[in-house]
Amino acid sequence: VDAMKQYAPGMGKVPVLSEFGVYNHNTQFVRGIGHAVYIANEMIDYIGFGTPYINKHCLVDYPYGADNLGSGSQCVIQAIKQNDGTTDFVSTPSAKMFSIFNNMTGTTQIGQKIEGNVTCYTYKGYNVPLVKAISSKDEQGNIYLTVVNNSRDERTDVNLIIDGKDLTGKDL
């Protein structure tokens, strides 16, 4: 965001992200789930930067014009041609991820601290943490916490402590 401000100083421009990266794998199922987890990680980062997310690389994949990773790998909606020539549409894991962020977050981001968060893996010199999270609250004071476990193979236990609240939402 700061780097963008130098190109349009004082103009009130807000950078908008128009594409999310692609997670490649041999099987479409793992690739679809992996891509959704990747999107969750990126969205947490972008929200932290104060940058809106509005678009996706490929909204709909049609069987006759699928992206180069194959049907359903990169799109939000997969089109499926039926035997009678009509087309049906189904949500992908990426669509579910957008739904979680659009419907299960509050309007105000609140602070959080993750202790003991180890590196899950390293990609091109960038350390990917085992857990990534974002916390927010709405106008009624409801608290939302979205946690992403970046390990495909390991279960990750998370202990939550919310200042001044128990997990039923009652004040302490």
What residue spans do the PLM features occupy?
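Carbohydrate-binding surface patches
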Residues: 124-169
